[in-house]
Structures are given as C-alpha cells and as structure tokens.
C-alpha cells in the first residue's frame, strides 16, 4: 500500500497488479481502510470468493463519506439521491444531506443481505463512478478458491465502467493472476518512483522508465545512480550515471576486486596489480583476458610489453548493466518494496559510496 499511497496518480485508469509478501495483505478479520491521497480516494478491502462479502466491505468503507459524492451526473442508479444531497450541501443543510445518504446506504445494505444482484451491482458501480477511487483488492491464494468467476466478472465490470482497480496478491500466485487478468499492468514504473521518493529523490515518469530499462530493476544500482544525480530529475539529461563506481557491481562478482584495482590505476601492466590482489598469476592473466573479451579493457602491446587500459564504452556498459544480477525477475525485487522497510544500509555497497 505504501507504493499506491506515494504515487496514487500512477494507478488511475487501469487494472494494476501488485505482487507482494503474504504478511502485507489484509487478514480475514480486517475490514480494510479508506484514505484520500492527493485528492484521490483509495478503498482497500479483502477479496474472497464470496462477492457478496467483498461488495459489503466496499460499502462499509464509504458509508460515512457522503460529502465526497459530488459529481452526481456520472451516476445511473441513485442519481436522484446524490443530486438531492448535493443541493442540500450547497445550501449548508448538511443534516438533511446526511440523513438522505444514510437512508440510501441502509437500502443498499438491505439489497446486499437479500442479494438482489442487479440492484447491488448497479448501485455500487454508480457510487464508485461518482467517487472515482482506486479500488484495491487484497487477494490471498486464489489457487485455493473453489469458485472465482463472480469476482473476476466483477473486476471486469468495474473496468468496463472506467473504475481504477489494483489487485494485491502473494508473489507465488503471480502466474495464476496473470493468466486470469492478462490485461493487468505490473506498474514497475510507479515502484521506481516510490523507491526514489523514499530516499529523497523526485524523478519523472520518463526517468523512472529509463532506470527500470537499463537496470532491470536492480535497486542497488538504481540507488547508486540516484546518489550521483540531482534531488529532482525531470529529464534524462539531468540523470548522471557514475560508470566507474557502478562497474565493479555489474560485472561477475569474481572480477570485482580486480576491477576495483583497475579503476584505481586506469592504465597498468600486470606487475602493477599482482601485489594488490590475492590471485595467482595465471588467474590474473585469465581474468584480464576475459575482461578484454567483455570490452571493459583494451590490451596494448608496445615494445614487447603488454599494457592494459580501462575502456568505458557506453553500449557495452549498458548491456552489462541490464544483464547484472538477472537471476530473478525484476518485478520480484521492486514490488517487495511494499512490504519491506527499505533502508540504504541494506545495500551491498552502501558503505563505499
């Protein structure tokens, strides 16, 4: 939920998916919550196979928020009620508006108890269209649901009426959720913006998209790039990538100590580095040849002697950056931001920057 609250505007006008930690989801005995962030209402409830309960929980969250339902022209059901309320509020007759609202909500709860499906769905969708919130459904292991068609259809009906929906679920259910909601968007761009905001950096959508593209969601590398840029990065020109500082962390870890020495020397002979790294001479030669093949070093032969020189080719470095630490899907790491209290001290190389 931290991600949604930090950048709610990034979760409007779509069906968004957020894989997260199980412990970060609502429990069965929790009602959910209602918040307004940046003038955007956020309704969070637990979704279960019982659609009746899920809708009742949404209504429970909005039952006291009559003053937010102003744009009654968007309503189909309950239009007369909402228009009446707005007229009374306009003339400071809040008591009458409130009384009419609670009467209407009471009728809706009765419709839910009797499960008058057409009335219930019509009324709740009308209310949500007027409020224009982000509806967040926390879903536990959907693979164990015996019946899920009604929930799926309800989500699709919400989207059909242009209501923003976010589904939060355990990471291990990701493939199942993707299959059920192929139109769902993994909003990785929003998580990068949130991550930057947590550490005091404000970045544009384009910058977030570029960082995600070049780092494959590697948070350590993203943080290091941000550390050497301005606090507010509006465009790519303002983004500074400290290649020399990043290089030891985007090559294979076996080269790390050697690359750190190479960066220090810039230009060297083999004998210049033998005493600085605890490797056998044969290992040093092999690693140097491999770094030459990677395009990080240039090998120079002059008067029978071999020298090496560091080579910073942007395209080669970008390729290495994209491939680094690619043993997990990028969304896995960045979406755990929603449940882990990130701190710069967790980063592998935070002490050296």
From Swiss-Prot:
InterPro entries, sorted: WH_DNA-bd_sf
Origin superkingdom: Archaea
Entries under SUPFAM superfamilies matching the protein: Winged helix' DNA-binding domain (SSF46785)
Name assigned to this protein: Uncharacterized protein MJ0772
């Amino acid at each position: 939920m931290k991600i949604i609250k930090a950048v709610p505007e990034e979760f409007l006008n779509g069906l968004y998916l957020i894989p997260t930690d199980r412990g970060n989801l609502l429990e069965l005995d929790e009602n959910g919550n209602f918040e307004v962030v940046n003038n955007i209402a956020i309704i969070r409830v637990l979704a279960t196979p019982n659609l009746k309960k899920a809708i009742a929980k949404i209504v429970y969250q909005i039952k006291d928020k009559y003053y937010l339902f102003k744009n009654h022209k968007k309503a189909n059901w309950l239009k007369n009620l909402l228009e009446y309320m707005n007229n009374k509020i306009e003339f400071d007759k809040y008591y009458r508006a409130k009384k009419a609202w609670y009467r209407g909500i009471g009728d809706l709860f009765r419709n839910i108890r009797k499960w008058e499906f057409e009335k219930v769905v019509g009324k709740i969708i009308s209310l949500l269209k007027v409020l224009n919130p982000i509806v967040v459904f926390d879903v536990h292991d959907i693979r164990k649901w015996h019946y899920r068609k009604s929930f799926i259809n309800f989500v699709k009906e919400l989207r059909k009426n242009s209501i923003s929906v976010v589904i939060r679920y355990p990471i291990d259910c990701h493939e199942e959720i993707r299959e059920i909601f192929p139109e769902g968007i993994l909003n990785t761009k929003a998580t990068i913006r949130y991550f930057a905001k947590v550490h005091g950096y404000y970045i544009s959508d384009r910058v977030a998209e570029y960082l995600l593209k070049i780092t494959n969601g590697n948070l350590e590398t993203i943080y290091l790039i941000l550390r050497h840029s301005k606090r507010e990065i509006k465009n790519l020109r303002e983004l500074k990538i400290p290649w020399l500082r990043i290089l030891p962390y985007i090559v294979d870890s076996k080269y790390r100590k050697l690359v750190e020495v190479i960066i220090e020397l810039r230009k060297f002979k083999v004998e210049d580095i033998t005493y600085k790294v605890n490797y056998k001479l044969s290992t040093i030669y092999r690693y140097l040849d491999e770094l030459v093949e990677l395009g990080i070093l240039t090998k120079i032969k002059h008067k029978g002697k071999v020298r090496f020189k560091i080579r910073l080719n942007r395209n080669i470095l970008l390729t290495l950056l994209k491939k680094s630490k690619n043993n997990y899907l990028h969304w896995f790491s960045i979406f755990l931001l929603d449940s882990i209290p990130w701190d710069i001290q967790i980063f592998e190389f935070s002490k050296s920057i």
